């Protein structure tokens, strides 16, 4: 970020870190459970495993042909494939997390890995698009971090299920913001379009089994608390408009 003078990325990263350190120092909350396994989490796990697994298998042959036709790019196939597997691992951890702290941990891994994959070729366009994806997702990550802080301070819990049951407007709204950025809803959809500069397997994984699905998963988890509320209406309108416009 410093080399490329992407100062918003630095500010968002520092802000997230400061919020989490402040929360851990002043409102230490021991999570009741670290995992949640139910029908929805298992469904998302199966989708990520099946679709993501097929993409990873396809990527092995694809990258060989890719660098045969694009000799101008340094061959970093090993790095590329390892990032795909890390992406899937983070997705599994995210959908099986029972509390916001662990979910946030895996949430931000997907943000960093997507940044590395989008910037794979290291061209000027790839670097620009990778940083755009990073700052937009870090903005959502900051909302996620503040939601953890508010939940710990006012609700004395970081269990996602308990936060949803309380219907607390502020943490729910902040988590919804995180979900909208991750799933590339307007006005954050441009980062997903920019991801197309990366080799095809990475953009396929972003669309079908990881980033976008992570945002959708979180919004589904929040839906009981947003039903019949202004926030729920806003999320529905944003999703509907994005569907029509994009």
What does each model-identified segment do?
Residues 1-246:
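...captures the hydrophobic TM-helix bundle architecture rather than a specific catalytic motif
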């Amino acid at each position: 970020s410093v080399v490329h003078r992407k100062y918003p990325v630095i500010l968002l990263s520092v802000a997230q870190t400061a919020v989490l350190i402040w929360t851990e120092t002043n409102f230490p909350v021991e999570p009741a459970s670290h995992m949640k396994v139910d029908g929805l989490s298992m469904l998302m796990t199966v989708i990520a495993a099946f679709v993501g697994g097929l993409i990873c298998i396809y990527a092995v042959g694809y990258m060989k042909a890719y660098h045969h036709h694009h000799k101008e790019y340094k061959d970093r196939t090993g790095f590329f494939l390892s990032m795909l597997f890390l992406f899937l691992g983070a997705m599994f951890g995210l959908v099986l997390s029972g509390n916001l702290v662990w979910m946030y941990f895996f949430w931000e891994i997907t943000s960093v890995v997507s940044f590395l994959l989008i910037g794979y070729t290291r061209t000027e366009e790839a670097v620009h698009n990778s940083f755009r994806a990073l700052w937009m997702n870090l903005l959502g990550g900051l909302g996620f971090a503040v939601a953890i802080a508010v939940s710990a301070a006012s609700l004395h819990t970081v269990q996602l299920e308990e936060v949803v049951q309380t219907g607390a407007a502020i943490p729910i709204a902040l988590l919804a913001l995180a979900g909208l950025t991750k799933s590339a809803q307007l006005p954050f959809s441009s980062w997903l379009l920019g991801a197309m500069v990366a080799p095809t397997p990475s953009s396929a994984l972003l669309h079908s089994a990881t980033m976008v699905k992570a945002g959708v998963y979180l919004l589904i988890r929040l839906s009981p608390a947003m039903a019949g509320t202004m926030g729920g209406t806003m999320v529905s309108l944003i999703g509907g408009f994005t569907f029509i416009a994009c």
